[in-house]
């Protein structure tokens, strides 16, 4: 079954499968299924075309998903960088934005270590 350009896994429960769509988390998935009148524990393979269509309609109406959600997130980050605020500077420098320490850790954000040569030890004569 395909929703918002994403192939949902047929063997998973509907509530879990919907979270494979970018922009839909567990709570949103539960709300969508409740509005469509579908039990969350039903598998995607068990849904008929009518139920699938109801899910698609609800998502199209009320949710920003996939490309639209990613685009909005990128626009928000770009705006922060353009206005030159602290958060924007942290994004620009690829450093943690939310106040985490950086002297140690922050490897995910900073990337692989760039080794800096230390002082050579003088040998005794």
From Swiss-Prot:
Gene3D superfamilies given in the database record: 1.10.8.50, 30s ribosomal protein s13, domain 2 (4.10.910.10)
Superkingdom per UniProt: Bacteria
Gene Ontology BP, a term: translation
InterPro entries reported for this sequence: Rbsml_uS13_C, Ribosomal_uS13, Ribosomal_uS13-like_H2TH, Ribosomal_uS13_bac-type, Ribosomal_uS13_CS
Pfam families from the UniProt entry: Ribosomal_S13
Record's keyword terms, sorted: Ribonucleoprotein, Ribosomal protein, RNA-binding, rRNA-binding, tRNA-binding
Compositionally biased tracts (Basic residues): 107-125
SUPFAM superfamilies, sorted: S13-like H2TH domain
A GO molecular-function annotation: structural constituent of ribosome
Coiled-coil parts of chain: none
GO cellular component: cytosol; small ribosomal subunit
Positions of the UniProt region annotated as Disordered: 92-125
Summary of the function given for this chain in its UniProt record: Located at the top of the head of the 30S subunit, it contacts several helices of the 16S rRNA. In the 70S ribosome it contacts the 23S rRNA (bridge B1a) and protein L5 of the 50S subunit (bridge B1b), connecting the 2 subunits; these bridges are implicated in subunit movement. Contacts the tRNAs in the A and P-sites.
Subunit structure: Part of the 30S ribosomal subunit. Forms a loose heterodimer with protein S19. Forms two bridges to the 50S subunit in the 70S ribosome.
Family per similarity comment: Belongs to the universal ribosomal protein uS13 family.
Protein name per the record: Small ribosomal subunit protein uS13
Taxonomic source organism: Chlorobium limicola (strain DSM 245 / NBRC 103803 / 6330)
Gene: rpsM
């Amino acid at each position: 079954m395909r929703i918002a350009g994403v192939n949902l896994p047929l063997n998973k429960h509907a509530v879990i499968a919907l979270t494979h769509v970018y922009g839909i988390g567990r709570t949103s998935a539960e709300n969508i299924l409740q509005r469509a009148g579908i039990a969350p524990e039903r598998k995607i393979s068990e849904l008929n075309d009518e139920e699938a269509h109801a899910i698609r309609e609800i998502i199209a109406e009320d949710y920003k998903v996939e490309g639209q959600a990613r685009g909005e997130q990128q626009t928000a980050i770009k705006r922060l960088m353009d206005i030159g605020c602290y958060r924007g500077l942290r994004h620009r420098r690829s450093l943690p934005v939310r106040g985490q320490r950086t002297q140690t850790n922050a490897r995910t954000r900073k990337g692989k270590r760039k080794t800096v040569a230390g002082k050579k030890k003088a040998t005794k004569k």
